[in-house]
């Protein structure tokens, strides 16, 4: 599981026979998540990412609470979604860039939310009853360029998106990709031959030099 350490990655590699002497290529074919913490990352983007990038992403995702994960899931499905793994990582630094309404999934629900639940529209109730909720929600989404997704409605808040990672190197503490050194069994280790020094060539013991106080 990630985030992981270099030692944990090496242990996993060695379990399938991958070492520095046998550096086989391996590929990422998806990911898994916890049942109580579903994360809807773009499959192709995950498979194309580097191990170090995914390790850093996993560490950053630990900073998101349930509402943050829900907003991320919606953001991955919006019209102009994330283009690379760096933008996914940067989302964790830019949670306030989006407004996420998880209970809204279509124009009618958006119209009802804005008209009756948000407190943004002040008018007599009888006037509200005459408004077409579908048309109202559709117009609102078009004007603010919002997106209806499986995980709710998402619209930009107006805050500026700040690049923290995209285009930069993974921080050193999250770089784990390397091949482990092969394990040498003691029985397989070559015998070390000890050279025999002729008695004539053996050094005589050094004389003891007394210390005068």
Spans of features found by a protein language model:
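Ordered hydrophobic segments in well-structured contexts
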Residues: 1, 25-29, 145-156
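Acidic, low-complexity, intrinsically disordered interaction modules
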Residues: 117, 123-135, 143-145, 149
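Mixed-charge (acidic/basic) macromolecular-recognition segments
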Residues: 12-129, 156-183
